[in-house]
Amino acid sequence: MSELFVQRLTVLDFSYLDVERGLVGESWQADIVLQGDLDAQGMVLDFGDVKKITKKLIDEQFDHKLLVPESSPAFQQASECLTFTFNHGKKIIHCAPDDAVTLIHADTITPETVSRQIIDTLMPLMPSNVLSIQIHLWPEKISGAFYHYSHGLKLHCGNCQRIAHGHRSRIEILRNGERDNELEAHWATRWRDIYIGTREDLIDETDGDYRFAYTSAQGAFALQLPKSDCYLIDTESTVENIAQHLADALKHEHPEDDFQVRAFEGVDKGAIGRA
């Protein structure tokens, strides 16, 4: 039996629900190994077909989505809305078109449970000579500060318009031209497992919750979650606006200093803000 591998086939940028952490933005890189017999070309599968079949499926069914552990007792589904109750008693209510959510056949979301579902979904699409698939999902190795955030971009023409998708992101802050690790750690802590919401999309609030809603090209979206898990900004939560928001906030707090912020959106991409 022969083996074929592709490292960093794609990156999944998504959010998921966890009974302890709440709504978590995440970014996982995907490696794949195909095991099987050689075909008439002397290949397990042509690399072009690997990307066409596997990357396409992963991107369509798992990327830029809300992943929900459907076996968790915290999960309840009613029509287009789902409710997920956290261990601390608070809850999230998410309403969206079906394409914005993927139910994972497990009680928790982990690289292993998601990998298993990707494999189960992929195998029926493989040619008969492919006998098994291995998927390795892994987060970027980050030595410095990072945070997990979720958001939705109602004006985006692609899947970023989904109200609860997210990223695991590095942050780099230059203060007068020098890295400031303390400020990086401060914002990473402040934005740990945060939902960055646009004030314009905030349609209601109670003592404990915010409710965001908008209609975009893909349909109607709504999200209710604890205020303590949210951070409000005045603009769309694009990475360009996030980077500039951070730079402006730092300048406001330290007006005598100059700042450059590199805010990442997942792996190896992002924007720069200056103030």
Stretch-by-stretch model annotation:
Residues 1-275:
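Charge-rich, low-complexity N-terminal segments
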